[in-house]
Amino acid sequence: MNKSLKDSLTIGLALFAMFFGAGNLIFPPNLGLEAGDNWFLAVLGLLFSGILIPILGIIVISYTGGSIIKLTRPISKNFYRWFILAITLFLSLVAIPRTGAVATEMGIQAIFPKIPTVVPVILFFAITCYFANDKSNVIDKIGNILTPMLGIILLVIVLKGIMTPIASPVETHLKNPFSTAFIGGYQTGDLLASFMIATIFLSDIVHKGYTSDKARNKITLNAAIIALLGLLIVYGGLLYIGATGSGIFPQGTERVELLLGLVTMILGRVGVVGLAIAVLLACLTTSIGLTSSVADYFNELSDNKISYKTFVRIICILGILIALLGVEKIIFITNPVFVVLYPISIVILLLGLFHKYIPNHGSYKGAVFFTFIISVAEALLSIGVKSTLLSNLISMIPFSSQGFEWILPAILGFISGSLVFKEKSKTKEESKTKEEYI
């Protein structure tokens, strides 16, 4: 095996591990349950938002210079600061607490159902705090064992669930399986994570000797394809298994309960225990890694006025308080955050993907601004704000019934921003010419 192929495989598996979080396992089966016999359309929706778009995040950052700063510079010189701050707050208040909640409900309570929730949650974040404080390399070594372990267990579940399905998918009368799964894919948070991990990931590629843009981009693309296939097998398989349970489990079954119920029917109690242990340990390593990264970021943001260890403790205390709400409540209360951040992130991604063909910086500014406005409006409605005018206005926008109300505003913002920027540039040029003439 030549060096390029070997490195592509190694980096591709590493990228798969970065995106493949134990906390995300609960989403595909639930989407399959909702889609029923329309599971294939749901797989396509999840493929785009939960797999393809996050991986494109890494590719686009590589192709636009290798950093989120360069990707977002056309929007505003300091836009990336606010954008990264928003993502970091998401990790602090959503992703990290969710790992604790999933570890408790799918890990500890799956084996010991009578244990009070507060006990494993406090223990989980105490361990997180201990290891994150030390920045121990032991966690990296454990992670290298746990990711393959979890992957093997899931592969067994997926293969068994596909080869000997528990039942046939039934009709569920879901109107828009593609868009439901597409929007459901927001909950993985992987696109937001891709903007955070891209620099580290790309630095590793350069460290391996791929220093030119062409070489770096080639390895990135190869690795992305490998990661995409791995995620498609796992997420697609879990979604299909959820669909096979659509005639057994009632709609609205809680996500953790559904996944544990499916695994019990496929592999019995042994499968549940194996999955619970792997998920518990994988959630722990994810929590430690995220806590360390977020604490580092806030420590730098404070110019070292507040210590790294203090931020670790703050994050863990917040993690305990939010994790005690439970997985379902965390998902419910964080939905508005995704409704705002994800459309903006997708627009930034698409602008970066086609950056060579973008007429001017006004296109970036207009597209992102219009997307932000409509996304905030939709988020307000999603949390129960009563506004007949706002609701009627959004319902008039094409694709709003499918959850894509931001597409047309983004296009209009792109066009209007481009025209305004062009006119301003023309006016400046004319003024400059007059001054030179005078």
Q: Predicted regions span which residues?
A:
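Transmembrane helix-boundary motif of multi-pass solute transporters/channels
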Residues: 8-46, 56-57, 69, 201, ...
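Hydrophobic, membrane-embedded alpha-helices of multi-pass small-molecule transporters
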Residues: 10-20, 25, 88, 92, ...
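Transmembrane alpha-helical segments of multi-pass small-molecule transport proteins
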Residues: 10-13, 17-19, 47, 82-86, ...
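Membrane helical hairpin/interfacial module
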Residues: 34-126, 133, 284
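Membrane-water interface regions at transmembrane-helix termini and the short interhelical loops
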Residues: 63-71, 125-146, 207-210, 320-332, ...
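TM-loop-TM module centered on a large, flexible mid-protein loop between adjacent transmembrane helices
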Residues: 68-74, 233-284, 291, 300, ...
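Hydrophobic, small-residue-rich membrane helices and short re-entrant helix-turn-helix hairpins
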Residues: 134-145, 177-181, 201-230, 247-260, ...
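A generic transmembrane alpha-helix motif of multi-pass inner-membrane proteins
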Residues: 157, 164, 361-438
